[in-house]
């Protein structure tokens, strides 16, 4: 199992960490030290985790659009890390990635998480942008539009002029939160597709 692999690696390595390795990432501008960005992202993630727990976890948010499109979004503890854009690791060496729900659980427990134990999931530049809108995106009453995604990895986006949450589709026809972008609904909409205007947002139990 994943957990057993982690334990095996720790035993073999003696649990040593690569703390002497500087947190450098290579973006368009060359090597970038993003420790401060990760600290900012973690601070926003902590605030957002509390809101996610209070408003979303274990619930279904039903979005009703003016043209009769209706969709239900299911919110699970394991989805939170994807919205943050952070991968969470067992220790500073980042050789063993923890399950996504572990980041959410540790944030809720007020555990101190070192920036060395997280890394951006995807492009480094996305991390700060996600963090900028993360807490605001925990309020689904602010969703004004639903659009078909121009990104092949995402089915729909639900959002507004500032941010959008990317949605994946489950086998039973419901949706789940897959990503968060700091872009307007029009920027992420697939060219030539209809924009669905939201009429009401309803919170329900699963």
Describe the predicted segments one by one.
Residues 2-152:
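An acidic, glycine-rich, mixed-charge low-complexity segment common to nucleic-acid enzymes
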Residues 123-206:
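Conserved binding-pocket/active-site segment within a compact domain
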